[in-house]
C-alpha cells in the first residue's frame, strides 16, 4: 500500500509526522485523534493552529479524525467574546472540533464563562487535559 507522510510545522507549532494511507481512513475504521495546545495570543500562531485543524479534517475526511484545541495561559484571550478569531472558532466548532478553555487560566485572569465565546468547552486544567489525551493515545501538537 502506498503511503504519504504529511509534515506539519511552522510559526512555533509542530507535529512530528502523520502517515496517511491512500484510503484516507485509519485502519479498522478507528478515528485519528489530535489535541492542539495554543498558549500564545499571537494571531499568526492561532491562524496556523486553526489551519492545521482544517488540514487534518481534509486529509482524513469527515468523521475520521477527532480534534481538540486546548487554550491556556496567554492564549486564553483568543477565546474571549471580543476575539477577532471568533468566526474561525465558530467554524471549527461547527465541524466538530472540541475547543477547550483552561479554567485555571480563567481564574487567574479573573474571567468567567460569560466572558468567553459561545459553544466552547471548559477543562479544569489545560495541561492536565493534554496529559490525559496523550495517555489516551492522542497525537499532540504544541504551540
What are these regions, as identified by a protein language model?
Residues 21-143:
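Secreted/extracellular ectodomain signature
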Residues 1-23:
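N-terminal export signals
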Amino acid at each position: 500500500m502506498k503511503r504519504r507522510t504529511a509534515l506539519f510545522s511552522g510559526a512555533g507549532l509542530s507535529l512530528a509526522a502523520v502517515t496517511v494511507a491512500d484510503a484516507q481512513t485509519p485502519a479498522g475504521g478507528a478515528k485519528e485523534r489530535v489535541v492542539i495546545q495554543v498558549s500564545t495570543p499571537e494571531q499568526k500562531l492561532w491562524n496556523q493552529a486553526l489551519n492545521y485543524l482544517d488540514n487534518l479534517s481534509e486529509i482524513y475526511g469527515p468523521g475520521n479524525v477527532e480534534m481538540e484545541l486546548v487554550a491556556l495561559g496567554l492564549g486564553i484571550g483568543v477565546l474571549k467574546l471580543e476575539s477577532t478569531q471568533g468566526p474561525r472558532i465558530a467554524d471549527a466548532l461547527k465541524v466538530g472540533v472540541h475547543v477547550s478553555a483552561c479554567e485555571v487560566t480563567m481564574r487567574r485572569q479573573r474571567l468567567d464563562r460569560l466572558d468567553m465565546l459561545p459553544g466552547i468547552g471548559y477543562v479544569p486544567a489545560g495541561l492536565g487535559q493534554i496529559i490525559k489525551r496523550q495517555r489516551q493515545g492522542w497525537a499532540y501538537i504544541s504551540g
